[in-house]
Regions:
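N-terminal regions that are enriched for targeting/export leaders
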Residues: 21-32
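N-terminal, post-signal-peptide region of Sec/Tat-exported proteins
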Residues: 43-75
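Second-shell loop/turn segments in exported
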Residues: 32-44, 88-95, 218-225, 234-235, ...
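Structural recognition of the beta-strand scaffold that forms the well-ordered cores
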Residues: 48, 73-76, 104-106, 115-118, ...
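Active-site signature of cysteine proteases
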Residues: 158-368
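Stable alpha-helical elements in mature extracytoplasmic
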Residues: 42, 47-51, 55, 100-109, ...
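Bacterial Sec-dependent N-terminal signal peptides
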Residues: 1-23
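Papain-like cysteine protease catalytic cores
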Residues: 71-175
Length: 368
């Protein structure tokens, strides 16, 4: 009986060891205010959700209060711009949904803003956004326009967006006042010229504005190119000074796990949707390794999110607290933590307020 008891105890202990799970535990170092997590759902509009979230945090930082701004108003204007661009490029443009942060700030500067309650952008039978049909129609009409050598008639193009997103109100009432999109944007006090995009790739000269060669940069917007250490210093300084960061990067890695572990690590291990038995060893990152991954297409322009803070794990490793636009259903919070090495390796670009850039770097970039 004693032998059976000992064997049973040993078996239970073995099962316990085998089933043990390593859990990353985080302590917040600095977290800046952000609005509620939203859900882009079945759309390729992460660029807009991330940048609007970033601008909403800017309003909180500026003491302007909490506002829920309409992403679909911006998306609509972005589609109109890229349809025109594609036509003049004889069909060689990009009419897919993806874009970058500066396309959002361009739309705000030229077309204004609308609160979500005045333009939710869902004019079809769905509780969440779904642009599957809309995207197909945009591609079809764009191709026909090029084929016929004639732009899409304005009433047809606007009718398409009215059908899916709803008609844009000329005026609306918000918090007891009547606005147009332009007057509402002006009332918020945001200056789109204050926001700049930063990247770090060595095939371009540093401390100059460059055109980043990614498909979503269809309007050839410019990024300031800096060494990797400077880019990370900009992110850290922004968070420390109370700003947040719009982040564009690669999430196609098996080491990016939003759902189960809510963590992104720079490693070769597959951690996506898996229980972690041990702490994962990360790979170091250099300017050269980062460049190599960009040029062999390992690092690609996948997704935009919103960095709102910094945390450290139980071993003292730094992470960036990151707000996604996939709703709350996947992991309960809508946030996850990306390690410093992951951000070093997988960042395509960032958008920040120019005042959040360290003075010495800003001087080298000649940003006034």
């Amino acid at each position: 009986m004693k032998k059976i008891f000992l064997l049973t105890t040993a078996f239970v202990s073995l099962v316990t060891v085998l089933s043990a799970q390593y859990k990353y535990e985080f302590t917040v170092v600095k977290e800046n205010p952000a609005t509620a997590v939203k859900n882009q759902a079945r759309t390729g509009t992460c660029w807009c959700f991330a940048t609007i979230s970033f601008l909403e945090s800017e309003l909180l930082r500026m003491g302007k209060g909490e506002h829920d701004l309409s992403e679909m108003y911006i998306v609509r204007h972005n589609y109109n711009r890229r349809i025109a661009d594609n036509y003049l490029r004889r069909g060689k443009g990009n009419v897919n949904p993806g874009s970058l942060s500066h396309m959002c700030t361009y739309a705000v500067k030229h077309f204004g803003l609308i609160p979500e309650e005045a333009y939710p952008g869902i004019n079809y039978d769905s509780p969440t956004h779904n642009h599957t049909e809309l995207s197909n129609y945009v591609k079809l009409l764009s191709a026909e326009a090029v084929k016929n050598k004639k732009r899409i008639p304005a009433e047809l193009q606007e009718g398409l967006f009215d059908a899916f997103l709803g008609k844009v109100p000329e005026t609306f009432v918000y918090q007891g006042k009547e606005y147009t999109p332009q007057s509402f944007a002006a009332s918020l006090g945001l200056n789109m010229d204050d926001y700049v995009e930063i990247t770090s790739f060595s095939h371009h000269p540093f401390y100059e504005q460059i055109i980043l060669e990614v498909p979503d940069n269809w309007d050839f917007g410019k990024h300031y190119n800096v060494p990797l250490d400077d880019m990370m210093a900009i992110i850290d300084n922004a968070i420390e000074k109370g700003y947040t960061v719009a982040w564009d990067g690669d999430i196609s890695e098996p080491s990016y796990d939003f759902n189960k572990n809510s963590i992104a690590l720079n490693c070769k291990d597959t951690i996506k949707n898996r229980e972690l038995k041990n702490r994962v060893k990360e790979l170091p990152v250099t300017q050269e390794s980062r460049q190599a991954d960009f040029e062999n297409f390992t690092t690609v322009d996948d997704h935009l999110e919103h960095i709102t803070g910094i945390a450290k794990d139980q071993e003292g490793v730094k992470y960036y607290i990151t707000k996604n636009s996939w709703g709350l259903g996947r992991n309960g919070t809508g946030y996850h933590n990306m390690s410093e090495n992951y951000v070093k390796a997988k960042t395509i670009g960032i958008m920040v307020h120019k005042n959040s850039i360290p003075k010495e770097i800003r001087a080298k970039l000649k940003i006034k």
